[in-house]
Structure formats: structure tokens, C-alpha cells
Amino acid sequence: MDVGAFALPLLALLGYSLTRLPQPTAQDIEQKSSRVTLNGKQRKELFIDFMPFLVLLFVANLMLVVLRDIKEDFLVKIIDMNGQSSWMFAQVDTVVTLIILALFGAMVFVKSNIKVLVALLGLVVLGTATMSFISFNYNSLQLDAITWLFVQSLCLYIAYLCFQSIFFDRFIACFKIKGNVGFFIVTIDFIGYTGTVLVLMFKEFAHADINWLEFYNILSGYVGLICTVAFTCSMIYLIQRYKKEKQLKKAKEAEMSNGIKFTGEGMEPTTFSQI
């Protein structure tokens, strides 16, 4: 209740601040593209257009949500916190949150959308790879409970929160998509909460005697490994797609300056005299 009483005025202040934001300037629209609501047909076309990329992100996010829910719901069974204050969990999460806020906040100073997207995916890949490494090597590393919890939380939440905050905003701006982040956030949340339901069902109906630390390390190790591959492939796709669209844009600019009609097929133009 104390936390809620402290957070409520801040939430109200932030909500009021959002209503006072100025309208986007022409430069803002040029850098980030205009944001409009998509209908069903447009959402389908957008998904098909970026399907390989989005499928990788959605599937990886599902696994991250399942791992996050297991960590939060079964944490007291996973690690031994005897002798530690009950505030230790909150302190670890606070430090993790501040680090992530600093990392994501620093992206404001980077104007290039593709650089931000690559940097974010790079952070995510680093996080999932580190999570997998410390999970598979838990016995040899011999980390204490607090260090293990801190590293696991930092790696997991960097990957999870990236797609709940700034990633899709920069994605829309980078590829000049006529839409908004609502479609992406709602879709990724829907898929993620499907994983949450599975975890809750497991919690209610599974009564097996499980070594939770061993189970979690195995699960986080494989989730980290799969997500590392998925996000690396996503980053490669993103870079290649951006280069391709940049080439198409240059060809269209050449069309305008040279009086040539761009066909978009094979990068071969057709002159107006041939029409």
C-alpha cells in the first residue's frame, strides 16, 4: 500500500504531462513518420511484409515471458535467501531497473533509427547469451545467490523490456511505417500472456517434486540460447532489409533527378520515352 500511495501521484503527474506534449513538428514527422491507426487489412499487410522478423521476435518474447513468470512466481523456491532481508529482492530489482533506464534513456541521443535498433538488439543478444552462459555454468562459476539473481534479472529484463518500450517506436520510424506501436505492443503482449497462462496452469496443477534451481537454470540456459539465435537472425534481417530499402530509395531519387521511371524490378529503369 505504501508503494502504491507513493506511485499514484507520480502516475497522475506523468499522465497530465502527456496531455501537455506539443504537437509534432514537420521535422518530427520527417524523422519518425506520421502515426495513424491501422485497420485489419493494414495490420495483416504489415505483418506479412515483415513476417520473418516479427515471427522471430514474437516467439522469442513468448519464451522470455514464460521464463520471467517462472522466476517471479517461484523465486523463493529457486534460490535460498535465508538470512537475507525481504527487501533484498526489491533492492536488486531497483538497481536493475535503474541500469535499464539509463541504457534505454541514452538512446535518445542517437538520432539514427537503424543504429538504435541494432544497438538494442545487440544489448538483447548480449543479455540472452550471458543468461545462457551463467545458467549452463552455474556450478563451475559458484556465484552467490544475490549475484546470480542480479545477473539473471538484468539479462532477462533488458531483453523483455526492450520490446515493451522503445524498440517498435524506432522500428516504425526507421522503415517509415504508416502505423503506430499499438499493433506491435498488443500482439506481443497477447502472445506473451499466453505464456503467462501456461505458467499459472503449471503452478496450479503440477505438484511434482522439482529441484527448482536446477530446473530454472536448464530452462533459462536453453531459452537464452534459442533467443540469442533468434535475435541475431532478427538483427541480420533488419540490417539487410534496411540496406535494400535504402538502395530502392536512392534509385527512386535518381528517377526524379534524371527523368527516369523506376520499375523496382532488377533495379533496371524504364525511360519515359519507352512508355
Question: What does each model-identified segment do?
Answer:
Residues 1-6, 201-229:
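A membrane-interface helix-boundary motif in multi-pass transporters
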Residues 1-57, 72, 81, 110-112, ...:
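Intracellular loop-helix junctions on the cytosolic face of multi-pass helical membrane proteins
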Residues 63-71:
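Conserved extracellular-gate-facing transmembrane-helix segments in secondary transporters
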Residues 70-87:
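Short amphipathic helix-loop junctions that connect adjacent transmembrane helices
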Residues 75, 159-175:
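Intracellular juxtamembrane helix-capping segments at the cytosolic ends
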Residues 85-113, 127:
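Transmembrane alpha-helices of Major Facilitator/SLC transporters
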Residues 115-161:
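C-terminal transmembrane helical hairpin of 12-TM major facilitator-type secondary transporters
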Residues 174-207:
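A late C-terminal transmembrane helix in Major Facilitator Superfamily
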